[in-house]
Every structure is written in structure tokens, then in C-alpha cells.
């Protein structure tokens, strides 16, 4: 089964989608979020989905259910829950005994049972230095004891074509040889060159993908409006839009959240790139996060898309020029989900599915690094 994967802690399927784009096929996904798994199953109907806490599943029972021999599976992937490591959690609430911080150990039990050729574990960058590196070295030690050669690194999604500044840590392990992480393909320091120069220069880095390149072709909306199953209003404008549209015919999930009267008053006063700091005193919130009530910049990548992307007070989530927060489809575009990927659930559930997942194009470069080692 050279191209088969199992996705643990799958969520809606960001990691799986990246591996799917690289040519892998999902056998099974496990997550305890029912709505996220419904989204996963809708997009990957041939994969078996199991809605349960991974701690309730015996690895040997799962291997028997999937009729797999030890060593037969190509890759086990998974983004273990990260809230217990995240810097967004106050330091006094981060501790090693937090149950969320122990789930990587359950992940490793599945590795021991299945012995896949390759392993990919994703988490927040803080996991690499959490508790004086104890977690990192425990993961290395366990995998090395099982015969794997392990590498770990934090990658910025914007350096691999994703129009979003988002850093994630990856552990990649192989039973055969030490895998190297892919080199960046995009850089904010890129200097534009004319076509003749490009033909002469190999190994150049492309410019970082911007918000305009990601969402500029989608039809305008007002707060509270949606554009479902409609046609694209114009042809794709760039390579990013081309690859995300792929063979998709109708736009889905282009839904803008309704705003309160004070939120509307705030956004109508803000220009592109401005935020709460630019609001008059009578409209400025008393307390706010950095970038809160901020409009995105057209010619820059987005800041990190979180599960709170629907709430303008939680970050820079206002559209660059329209008086609303970005739609679900726009958030998905900024996260590099193809337009063929359809999200299910309420507005907030869909926002969470995007914000808590791995950007597919970032996952794809990891998958392609594994393919090159096959």
C-alpha cells in the first residue's frame, strides 16, 4: 500500500488534502469532532471515518479493522491537539500533565502497532521547546527506539505558497533514511525579475502569495450575505486561483457573517490595513488584541487564520475593501483549500474547521518530500 495513509486527529482534513494533492489516498480518519468528520467524509467518501477519542481506540483493533499487516501502511499523519502547548494559552495554564499534552503519546502507540514506512506529526512551534525540550526529545526517543530516523522543524506556510503567515512544527520520520525538509519556494525578499532574467536564473524564489491573489476573483458580498452555487464572475487571474479552482464549476461556502451595528460602524471607518488603533475614541474597544478589527492588506499575505476568523475583535479578519469579515470561502482560500473542498456545519463550526487545520499546500510539500524518498 505505497500510497495509503491514516490521519489521526484529522479534523476536517487539511493534512489529508495536502497528501491527496500529492497523490496519496486516505484509508481512515479519526477525530472526536463530529461535524469536522462529516466534512472530512463528504470530501473523502472512500475513507473510513471514526468519531471517537483516540484514547478509546486500541491500535491493534484499528489495524485489524483495516485488514493491514504490520509494516504495510505507507504513512501515518496527524496534527495532535495543540492548545496545551500554544502560546495563546496563558503560561500559568500550560503544564505537562495537561491531558491535551499527552495525546502525542497515544499517537506514538499507533506508530508502534502499524509500523508505517513514514510518520508525520504536526503541532505548534512551541512543542519543539516546550518544557526545556522534553516533549521533542521524548518523541525523538520513542520513534528512534522503533527504528525510525527523525527530523523536526518549524515551517512558515507563506514560504511555500500559502497566502498566510502561519508557522507550524513538523516531525517527519522514516524507517529507511533521514528525510530532509523541503526548501522554501516563496520569499518576501524576492526581487521581481523580467522573463528573460528568469529563464537564465534557476533556483529563484517566487514572491509570497498575497491576499489579492488568493481572493480577488471572488464575488463581492455584504455582511450577512452569501453566494452559494453561483458561477465565477470572471476567469482566474493568477496561478494560485487557477490551482485552487482546478475543475470546480460552482462557488460554495462564500458566506459572510452578519455584523452588529457597532461592528459595522467600526469597519466603515477603516481603510485597508487599518485596525482598532485607527478608530475614534467613541468607537474604539477598551481592550483589544494586536490587529483586532483590522482590515487585511491586499498586497500582503494574511496573518494567521484562527478558529475565531469570524470575529473581527479576534484579529485582522476584515475584508480589505468590503465592509465585512472575510467569508468562509475566502478563509479557505487564504488557508489554501481547493474550491472543490466543501465545508459542512454552522458558520462558526466551518470557521473552526479551517482555523484548526493544516494549510493543504503546506502539507503537500511534506507529502512530496516523502514521495521523493519512495
Language-model features: locations:
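Core alpha/beta nucleotide-donor-binding catalytic domains of modification enzymes
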Residues: 2-115, 125-129, 134-137
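A structural signal for well-ordered alpha-helical segments within the folded catalytic domains
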Residues: 13, 105, 133-137, 209, ...
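Proline-centered helix-kink/hinge sites
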Residues: 45, 80-81, 116, 163, ...
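Short alpha-helical segments and helix-capping/turn motifs at coil-helix boundaries
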Residues: 60-62, 154-158, 288-291
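Class I S-adenosyl-L-methionine
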Residues: 65-70, 83-283
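Short connector loops/turns at beta-strand edges and beta->alpha or beta->beta junctions
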Residues: 81-85, 176, 310-311, 339-340
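C-terminal target-recognition/interaction regions appended to catalytic cores
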Residues: 230-374
Amino acid at each position: 500500500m505505497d500510497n495509503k495513509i491514516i490521519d489521526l486527529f484529522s479534523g476536517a482534513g487539511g493534512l489529508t488534502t495536502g497528501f491527496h494533492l500529492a497523490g496519496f489516498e486516505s484509508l481512515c480518519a479519526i477525530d472526536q469532532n463530529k461535524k469536522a468528520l462529516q466534512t472530512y467524509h463528504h470530501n473523502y467518501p472512500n475513507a473510513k471515518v471514526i468519531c471517537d477519542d483516540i484514547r478509546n481506540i486500541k491500535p491493534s483493533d484499528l489495524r485489524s479493522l483495516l485488514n493491514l499487516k504490520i509494516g504495510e501502511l505507507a504513512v501515518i499523519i496527524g496534527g495532535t491537539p495543540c492548545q496545551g502547548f500554544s502560546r495563546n494559552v496563558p503560561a500559568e495554564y500550560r503544564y505537562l500533565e495537561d491531558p491535551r499534552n499527552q495525546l502525542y503519546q497515544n499517537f506514538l502507540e499507533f506508530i508502534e502497532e502499524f509500523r508505517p514506512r513514514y510518520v508525520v506529526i504536526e503541532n505548534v512551534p512551541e512543542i519543539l521547546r516546550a518544557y526545556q525540550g522534553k516533549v521533542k526529545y521524548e518523541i525523538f526517543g520513542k520513534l528512534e527506539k522503533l527504528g525510525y530516523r527523525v527530523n523536526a522543524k518549524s515551517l512558515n506556510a507563506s514560504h511555500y505558497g500559502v497566502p498566510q503567515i502561519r508557522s507550524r512544527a513538523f516531525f517527519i520520520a522514516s524507517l529507511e533514511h533521514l528525510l530532509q525538509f523541503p526548501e522554501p519556494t516563496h520569499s518576501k525578499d524576492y526581487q521581481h525579475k523580467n522573463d528573460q532574467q528568469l529563464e537564465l536564473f534557476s533556483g529563484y524564489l517566487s514572491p509570497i502569495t498575497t491576499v489579492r491573489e488568493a481572493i480577488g476573483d471572488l464575488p463581492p458580498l455584504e455582511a450577512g450575505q452569501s453566494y452559494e452555487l453561483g458561477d465565477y464572475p470572471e476567469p482566474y487571474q493568477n496561478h494560485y486561483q487557477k490551482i485552487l479552482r482546478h475543475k470546480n464549476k460552482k462557488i460554495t461556502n462564500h458566506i459572510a457573517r452578519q455584523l452588529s451595528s457597532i461592528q459595522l460602524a467600526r469597519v466603515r471607518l477603516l481603510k485597508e490595513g487599518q485596525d482598532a488603533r485607527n478608530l475614534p475614541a467613541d468607537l474604539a474597544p477598551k481592550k483589544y488584541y494586536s490587529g483586532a478589527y483590522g482590515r487585511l492588506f491586499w498586497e500582503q499575505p494574511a496573518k494567521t487564520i484562527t478558529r475565531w476568523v469570524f470575529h473581527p475583535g479576534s484579529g485582522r479578519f476584515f475584508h480589505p475593501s468590503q465592509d465585512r469579515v472575510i467569508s468562509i470561502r475566502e478563509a479557505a482560500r487564504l488557508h489554501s483549500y481547493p474550491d472543490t473542498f466543501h465545508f459542512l456545519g454552522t458558520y462558526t463550526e466551518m470557521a473552526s474547521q479551517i482555523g484548526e487545520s493544516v494549510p493543504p499546500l503546506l502539507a503537500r510539500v511534506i507529502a512530496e518530500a516523502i514521495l521523493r524518498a519512495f
